[in-house]
Amino acid sequence: GYELVEYGADKDAAKEMTNMEDLLSLNPDVILYNPVDSDAAGATLALANDAGIPVITVDRVANSGEVISHLASDNVYGGKIAGEYIVEQLGDDGGEVVEIQGQAGTSAARDRGQGFHEAVDDVEGIDVVVSDIGNWDKAEGMTIMENALQAHPDIKAVFAHNDTMAMGAMEACQAAGREDIVIVGFDADDDAVQAVKDGKLAGTVAQQPELMGTGGVDLAHDYLEGKEIEKSTAIEVTLITKIILLYLL
């Protein structure tokens, strides 16, 4: 069997580096690493590289440094299906759309944004009038939406890179009496799924975090057993809507 040691960084890249130093003092066989920030991760990863300890990144990539494998949701595809659903919901009339981005420098935000824009940028009638950074935070998502509604009162839809920001946008829309706005989030957390059931959110992209966790451990096990492992693995995501939830129930 294996002994699992966990450290949490609380979204703090500096704490993450301290955690890595503490972890390396234990001389682990392999490290599973979910970076706070893809850019800042390079310096933290360098500590493990210099120590000769193999690292598998999970969920977010490190933009520099060496890893033996990377495992994450297919965030590009997730952003794309969210964008396609918004296009479908707006129909031929199209309309003005808001994008609330995740934290700058994270691969999840970059990839979800990429997929979203692949879906909407070339669609006639769709105009992304606001694309601001909400840092995965509900209050920031709400503020972005409040400001967007003031500047663009005819907004028809929102894509938020996570459900937390989507819920903030939803509350801003409710306060403005704009429950008609199509809002799509990402993560399928419990509050968002309930909001989809209630018709307050149009949809949310569901990840499979359990597979990321078990898949990371499986990759580490195979590596330690001397087996060849994939350099990169994408985990499937799906769009959850009210119709789908009614069908599942």
PLM regions and their residue ranges:
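A residue-level marker of the well-folded mature domains of exported/periplasmic proteins
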Residues: 1-249
